[in-house]
Amino acid sequence: MPRHHQKNSGREASQRQLRVGESVRHAIAEILAQGGVHDPVLEGHLVTVPEVRMSPDLKLATIYVMPLGGRDTELVLKALDHNKKFLRGEVSRRVNLKFAPELRFRADDRFDEAERIEKLLRTPAVQRDLQHDSDESE
């Protein structure tokens, strides 16, 4: 079977998935920044769109969002979900695809996870282990 016909095993996104995901990310970010969605919750929040992951068939876009300041995340996710149909139509007009992808909104928790790891690395037990490892390597 030729290589370009093999299914993506889900381990790594294809170049096409990455390219389309970035186009969808730009479209959603632009719509939100311009106030294109008439929703009181979204009008009251600045929402960042750090990442969009596309399914291998490009029919599903998982959009990771984060309200600036990290407040009211659940409220913003509900508002985006409520306006999903409008946003999907806008994405289909702005991004040239055979099918408009279904949109799925998720909270981007990478900053929370990074903060948790930073706190863990600063704990006395981990500091002691790190110091012990560096002493052994000398």
Curated annotation (Swiss-Prot):
Function: One of several proteins that assist in the late maturation steps of the functional core of the 30S ribosomal subunit. Associates with free 30S ribosomal subunits (but not with 30S subunits that are part of 70S ribosomes or polysomes). Required for efficient processing of 16S rRNA. May interact with the 5'-terminal helix region of 16S rRNA.
Record localization: Cytoplasm
Location (main, coarse): cytoplasm
Keywords, sorted A to Z: Cytoplasm, Ribosome biogenesis
InterPro entries found in the cross-reference section: KH_dom-like_a/b, RbfA, RbfA_dom_sf, Ribosome-bd_factorA_CS
Native source organism of the sequence: Rhodopseudomonas palustris (strain BisA53)
Protein name: Ribosome-binding factor A
Alphabetized Pfam families for the sequence: RBFA
Source organism superkingdom: Bacteria
Stated family: Belongs to the RbfA family.
Subunit structure: Monomer. Binds 30S ribosomal subunits, but not 50S ribosomal subunits or 70S ribosomes.
Gene Ontology CC: cytosol
GO molecular function term, any single one: ribosomal small subunit binding
GO biological process annotation, one example: maturation of SSU-rRNA
